[in-house]
């Protein structure tokens, strides 16, 4: 991949800089990193040169023609990336022919030709869909690809992934060959029936993301520095919210790889905020509900009489005075209200659990080498609220885990 070769050359440049300064350990570190990213004969020779000089303590000899060509090539690549191949007085071209051809290949398709856009067959798996999206998104991101219509191609790839990664939207598309959003009401009603009739039930919040937010959810931890990004469900008709600004400059994303790891506190801060928000919102929700409908999910001095719903045996509490005033019809309606509210709470908590598990898996996979032990633990994380949702008769799906 071109981006891997460029990163390898950047590491070679840093290694040569440290070698000239006599810092052999740092030079060796970046030279070895270059080989891991993109192995070359020149890189291997350079590592041997550094090790030899480290043992002898001799200064850096005059660069060989091969090394000079390597440095010139790196400088030229930097120049092409920043200024483009252009002569004086002409408009600067900031893209390569390969980038331009890729853009033209994508935009030649119609907006709803999702399989063709991602270069996939209709029998493709979820893993193949994710791999294709990640590859194309990196090549077409507007901060990386400046070819004409690259932004349009990037949006088409994002849209194709959003449809094909959602089993319900994909099934609708396979049946009709049309954009599922062109018949939003029909798709919504069909989805509600598949989910047990629960309004606004969806375990795929990425369907509501913008192309940039979708890209950040895949690559944010690897390409960005600064505050983290996290998501939470917001009740019926789930929406996705993003917190913490991220710079758009693509070069800064790559430089972030060399930054020291954040402290555990800053890594866990987004999760702490999500949990705190969920606790406060659920507390206020339950409190207001108990006032309006005269029941509570928690027993207290006012609500002392234990009750359970008829359908799912969900426990709640009432006061004896209020209970005596209710007719059998009122009690039946109250039971329906309790079950609906309880299901909403569990549904939102399930989405949060799925997002947390997905974040843990992505963090364990890393950028170059996965942490196998951490990845195993992340995959084994239980989702108790999702299990409860299944017990209530609702179908749930994994929130796009990266297995």
From Swiss-Prot:
GO terms for cellular component: endoplasmic reticulum; endoplasmic reticulum membrane. Keywords: Endoplasmic reticulum, Membrane, Phosphoprotein, Transmembrane, Transmembrane helix. The keyword Endoplasmic reticulum applies. It holds the Pfam family DnaJ. GO terms for molecular function: Hsp70 protein binding. CDD domains: DnaJ. It is found in: Endoplasmic reticulum membrane. Residues 55-95 are annotated as: Disordered. Residues 113-177 form the J domain. SUPFAM superfamilies: Chaperone J-domain (SSF46565). It is a single-pass membrane protein. The chain crosses the membrane at residues 263-283. This is Uncharacterized J domain-containing protein C17A3.05c.
